A protein has these predicted regions:
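Mg2+-dependent phosphoryl-transfer enzymes with acidic/Ser/Thr/Gly-rich catalytic loops
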Residues: 58-65, 92, 98-100, 104-107, ...
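Active-site phosphate/pyrophosphate-handling residues
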Residues: 7-10, 70-73, 115, 139-142
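Acidic di-acidic motifs
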Residues: 4, 42, 135-136
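Alpha-helical architecture
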Residues: 2-6, 66, 163
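Conserved alpha/beta core of the MobA/IspD/sugar-nucleotide pyrophosphorylase nucleotidyltransferase superfamily
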Residues: 1-31
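Predominant activation on well-ordered alpha-helical scaffold segments within soluble catalytic domains
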Residues: 10-13, 73-76, 118, 178-182
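Alpha-helical substrate-recognition element adjacent to the catalytic core
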Residues: 26-115
Length: 189
């Protein structure tokens, strides 16, 4: 991309937001799986925008994108399960998962996320190649290696974007999960 003036900027920004795939030239990307049985999603930085508000008594509050829930329910109707897999220990993860109608496994040690993912797949008898993982931070990288397709939110850390098979146009907490759901639902039609 060569930006010489403001009109170039607007043109290329429109191109990116219209669905241009952002990739790392050194990474061999895998295609979206033909069959998807499960989407595993990180919580902070995917369902939320990675920010937290703390009041004077230490209670934490987050914000989530409500429209994610609508598309998650549609995925479940076509037989694709969704599970939140998070290192976050706060009960807000369970509360949001319940509202979304999905299972949440949270409080997972940062260095054990990949192991926990493998255990989920074993218990549910799901092949890794039929799993999509969406994340944003370096503790998600072991899950990226296991999943059949790894997806990064637009504002993920550079190492995560480099490792991803696909990078969304939406940032975490602002419709990233819905964008992924839309992409998968469109493919399954």
């Amino acid at each position: 991309v060569d930006i010489d003036n403001l009109s170039d900027w607007a043109k290329y920004e429109a191109l990116v937001y219209s669905g241009l795939e952002i990739v790392s030239p050194g990474k061999k990307r895998r295609p979206i799986p033909e069959k998807i049985d499960l989407i595993l999603s990180d919580f902070d930085g995917v369902i939320t925008d990675n920010r937290v508000w703390v009041n004077q008594d230490g209670t934490e509050t987050i914000a989530a994108f409500r429209s994610d829930s609508v598309r998650v329910r549609e995925l479940r109707k076509v037989g694709i399960d969704v599970i939140i897999l998070s290192s976050e220990v706060n009960r807000v993860v369970e509360a949001r998962a319940k509202k979304m109608g999905v299972e949440a496994i949270h409080g997972v040690a940062l260095h054990e996320k990949g192991q926990v993912m493998q255990e989920i797949l074993r218990q549910k008898n799901i092949k890794a190649e039929n799993v999509v993982f969406i994340g944003n931070d370096i503790n998600d990288l072991p899950c990226f290696e296991i999943a059949g397709w790894s997806v990064a939110v637009a504002d993920a850390y550079p190492e995560v974007i480099h490792a991803a098979d696909f990078v969304l146009t939406k940032p975490g907490g602002h419709g990233a999960l819905r964008e992924l759901c839309d992409l998968i639902l469109k493919k399954s039609r």
